Structure formats: structure tokens, C-alpha cells
């Protein structure tokens, strides 16, 4: 595991209720975005003037995260480069009288960035990076897990990670996920979350008929997970129908064992950047939002 320490100038007290770790899986090849993802990692595709993944990082930092674990592919270099200091660039900006740009390229303050390498051979699926990170989550500890090819833009300066952590704590639970409210026309095209009367997770119904949909919330792949779910992600076999190691299988196993997962509603504009059309929509939307 590689680690970059970014100017740790303060010491923060940690409480039992503070979630200080986040896992961001970014090892995918981004095949839907080929050929550009042959040379640009999917999570580093620009939306506006920032890479996709940095919008996620900014959200979780606002929630108090101090350790960010990127699960990267074996050939990954760009995420590492983005989050470390570039001395030559800094020197150039100073010489050119562009010191006002230095804060834009400065390393994150008071945050440690870790890199875990996901092997290119072996299992495939969303539970693989979560299982790899399991050893860095202590018993009784909670961590955010956010997939690295999508984000929510919030013009209010708020944090979906902070909102989800507050919801989990308010319900006295140790796990939660955010649902993304979708338009009616999209409900038959996606997995829709079913909740119980308390607003806790029951299951995901894939592509339901509109009249049979239990809600308008799709899974946004934005989680608070406990150590037990991390271990389930590490140990469960591949899904027998699809042959992939799926995080939803670990979540379903946790529910089947009596676990309870809170469901919240994400705020902001959803930016899906894993497909050409989604990435273009995200850039168009950000251009409009930033122009206002």
C-alpha cells in the first residue's frame, strides 16, 4: 500500500460517532469510455476543471474524513499524481506571477491519501475493492464507500456523506446508503430501492414496472458500511447468476443475518460519468451551474 501524507498540521480528536475513513474504488478500465480511457483513467475524466473523483473527495472531506483509500488498478498513476505536490508546476506559477493558482493545485490539508492496488487478474465486481480495504477497517469502525465514477453536485455547500452519517447515527445503526431520486421515466430502467415503514433497506428491485415500483430511489452506490459488511464483501463467493463479486450480495447477506441499513435520499444534481452520454450531460450541467 502506498500512502501520501498531506501536510498534517493539526491533531484532531476522534470520537466514536465520527467516520474518518472512506474507500473509493477506481480500478475499473472504463470500457464504455474507450478509447479515451486507454490513456486517461475513468475517474480522472474532467467535469469542468476537476476530475470526476475529486468531487467525491471534496464531499467526504466536508463530512470529516481524514483517511481516503483509493483502490486503484495496477497501471494507475494519474490519481496519485493529482493528489501529490507538483514542485515544478508550483515553481512555474510563482515565476509567471500566477500565485493565485497555487491553492487550486495544493495537496489536501489534514488528509491522508492511501492507495491500495487491485490485482488485474482474479475476481471482478464491486465487492472486490471493498474486500481489499477490509483489513484497514477496525472492529466497531464505520467507513464511507463511494464508487469513483459518479457524484452529486450540491450548490448549497453541503455534504451527502455528512447527511448519511447523521442519518445512520440518528437511527442508532451502523450502516446506511443513499438513494438517488429518479424521474418516473427512468424507474423501469434501473434498480429501485424498497424500504420498510421505518425507512430502512429491504431490497433492490431491478427494473420494476412503474406501477409496481416501491419508491423512486435508485441505488447511488454511496454507503456507510461497518466491519461486518466489509468482511462479507471479502469472503462471499461470486454471484452464481452473473459470475461477479457484487457488493449488493454482501449487503443482502447482512440484511438476511438480521442487520439493518438506513436509507437516505441524496441531495443535489446526480452526475453519472461512466458512460459517454452521462459524462457529456455532467459537463453540460456543470457548465450551466457554474455559469449561474
Spans of model-derived segments:
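Short, positively charged and aromatic/hydrophobic N-terminal segments
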Residues: 3, 7-12
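Catalytic-core segments of class I nucleotidyltransferases/pyrophosphorylases
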Residues: 144, 157-158, 162-165, 169, ...
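N-terminal glycine-rich phosphate-binding loop and ensuing alpha1 helix
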Residues: 17-95, 99, 113, 157-159
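Active-site metal-binding loops of divalent metal-dependent hydrolases
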Residues: 29, 149-150, 276
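Conserved beta-loop-beta/alpha segment of the NTase-like Rossmann-fold superfamily
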Residues: 79, 89-92, 101-195, 234
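A structural signal for short hydrophobic beta-strand segments in well-ordered beta-sheet cores
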Residues: 44, 193-195, 263
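Residues at the starts of beta-strands that form the adenosine-phosphate
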Residues: 21, 66-68, 142, 174, ...
Amino acid at each position: 500500500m502506498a500512502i501520501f501524507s498531506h501536510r498534517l498540521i493539526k491533531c484532531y480528536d476522534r470520537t466514536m460517532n465520527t467516520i474518518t475513513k472512506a474507500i473509493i474504488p477506481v480500478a475499473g478500465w472504463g470500457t464504455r469510455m474507450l478509447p479515451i480511457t486507454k490513456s486517461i483513467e475513468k475517474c480522472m475524466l474532467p467535469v469542468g476543471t476537476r476530475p470526476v473523483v475529486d468531487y467525491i473527495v471534496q464531499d467526504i472531506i466536508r463530512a470529516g474524513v481524514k483517511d481516503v483509500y483509493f483502490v486503484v488498478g495496477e497501471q494507475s498513476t494519474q490519481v496519485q499524481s493529482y493528489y501529490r505536490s507538483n514542485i515544478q508546476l508550483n515553481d512555474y506559477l510563482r515565476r509567471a506571477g500566477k500565485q493565485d493558482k497555487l491553492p487550486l493545485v495544493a495537496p489536501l490539508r489534514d488528509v491522508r491519501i492511501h492507495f491500495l492496488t487491485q490485482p488485474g487478474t482474479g475476481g471482478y465486481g464491486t465487492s472486490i475493492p471493498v474486500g481489499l480495504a477490509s483489513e484497514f477497517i477496525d472492529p466497531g469502525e464505520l467507513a464511507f464507500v463511494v464508487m469513483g465514477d459518479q457524484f452529486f453536485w450540491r450548490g448549497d455547500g453541503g455534504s451527502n456523506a455528512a447527511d448519511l452519517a447523521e442519518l445512520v447515527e440518528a437511527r442508532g445503526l451502523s450502516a446506511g446508503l443513499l438513494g438517488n431520486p429518479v424521474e418516473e421515466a427512468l424507474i423501469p430502467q434501473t434498480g429501485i430501492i424498497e424500504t420498510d415503514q421505518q425507512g430502512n433497506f429491504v431490497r433492490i428491485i431491478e427494473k420494476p414496472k412503474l406501477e409496481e415500483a416501491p419508491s423512486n430511489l435508485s441505488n447511488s452506490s454511496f454507503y456507510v458500511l461497518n466491519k461486518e459488511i466489509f468482511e462479507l464483501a471479502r469472503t462471499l463467493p461470486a454471484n452464481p447468476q452473473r459470475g461477479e463479486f457484487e457488493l449488493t450480495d454482501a449487503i443482502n447477506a447482512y440484511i438476511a443475518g438480521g442487520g439493518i441499513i438506513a436509507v437516505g435520499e441524496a441531495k443535489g444534481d446526480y452526475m453519472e460519468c461512466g458512460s459517454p452520454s452521462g459524462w457529456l450531460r455532467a459537463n453540460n450541467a456543470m457548465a450551466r451551474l457554474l455559469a449561474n
